[in-house]
């Protein structure tokens, strides 16, 4: 039973570095009996660069902090109104590979958007979720000793302007969108509720809310 239980934590809004340090401490301290966790959080404005990023993808920061991370992928923006999920998963214990986890993450977002009558899709060799050739959800993970860190960022109701200061995910032609563009009354808490519902379907687990 232990391997099926995931603790869900709603961290509210935090500075990226605060959450990053919590993730690292969690990974360092976890053992084979540690429950997996998924963290829901928003961040204050920040650009995060993945290990594959090239400096040319940052056009201008406009006084928004820029940090280098240890996740995969390239550069993206985080800000209030964006729902971030960090997946702290023991892949070996769940007999799951990284591609299977990414598929679960993407399909969870697609089904969540479907609840808002939004048709979304994935692209081969381009992780994330898209609507009408625009990106609404970015993914970036790291695996350390079989444990995952980082996760996904779903644009809900946020200021998208800072995405114009970068080449999102290293693509100068990439445009971003959000749920608000399709549903002006969307609330983050409603999206979070549906994400939890869809996650529980795909992972077939008990999700325990632990604030």
From Swiss-Prot:
It is found in: Cytoplasm. GO terms for biological process: protein modification process. Residues 32-207 form the BPL/LPL catalytic domain. It catalyses: octanoyl-[ACP] + L-lysyl-[protein] = N(6)-octanoyl-L-lysyl-[protein] + holo-[ACP] + H(+). The keyword Translocase does not apply. The active site is at residue 169. Keywords: Acyltransferase, Cytoplasm, Transferase. InterPro entries: aa-tRNA-synth_II/BPL/LPL (IPR045864), BPL_LPL_catalytic (IPR004143), Octanoyltransferase (IPR000544), Octanoyltransferase_CS (IPR020605). Pathway: Protein modification; protein lipoylation via endogenous pathway; protein N(6)-(lipoyl)lysine from octanoyl-[acyl-carrier-protein]: step 1/2. GO terms for cellular component: cytoplasm. GO terms for molecular function: lipoyl(octanoyl) transferase activity. Substrate binds at residues 71-78, 138-140, 151-153. It is an enzyme of class 2 (transferase). It holds the Pfam family LplA-B_cat. The keyword NAD does not apply. Its EC number is 2.3.1.181. The record marks 135 as: Lowers pKa of active site Cys. In the reaction, the free carboxyl group of octanoic acid is attached via an amide linkage to the epsilon-amino group of a specific lysine residue of lipoyl domains of lipoate-dependent enzymes. Belongs to the LipB family. Catalyzes the transfer of endogenously produced octanoic acid from octanoyl-acyl-carrier-protein onto the lipoyl domains of lipoate-dependent enzymes. Lipoyl-ACP can also act as a substrate although octanoyl-ACP is likely to be the physiological substrate. This is Octanoyltransferase. The gene is lipB.
């Amino acid at each position: 039973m232990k391997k099926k239980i995931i603790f869900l934590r709603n961290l509210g809004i935090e500075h990226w570095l605060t959450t990053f340090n919590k993730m690292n401490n969690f990974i360092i301290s976890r053992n084979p009996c540690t429950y997996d966790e998924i963290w829901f959080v928003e961040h204050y404005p920040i650009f995060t660069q993945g290990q594959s990023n090239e400096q040319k993808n940052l056009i201008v920061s406009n006084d928004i902090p820029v940090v280098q991370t240890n996740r995969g992928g390239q550069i993206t923006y985080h800000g209030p109104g964006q729902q971030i999920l960090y997946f702290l998963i023991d892949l070996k214990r769940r007999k799951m590979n990284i591609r299977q986890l990414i598929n679960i993450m993407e399909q969870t977002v697609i089904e969540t958007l479907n609840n808002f009558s939004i048709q979304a899709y994935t692209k081969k060799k381009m992780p994330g979720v898209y609507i009408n050739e625009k990106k609404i959800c970015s993914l970036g993970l790291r695996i350390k000793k079989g444990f995952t860190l980082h996760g996904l960022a779903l644009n809900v109701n946020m200021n998208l302007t800072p995405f114009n200061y970068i080449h999102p995910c290293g693509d100068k032609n990439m445009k971003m969108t959000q749920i608000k563009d399709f549903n002006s009354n969307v609330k983050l808490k409603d999206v979070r509720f549906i994400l939890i519902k869809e996650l529980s379907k795909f992972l077939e687990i008990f999700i325990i809310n632990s604030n």
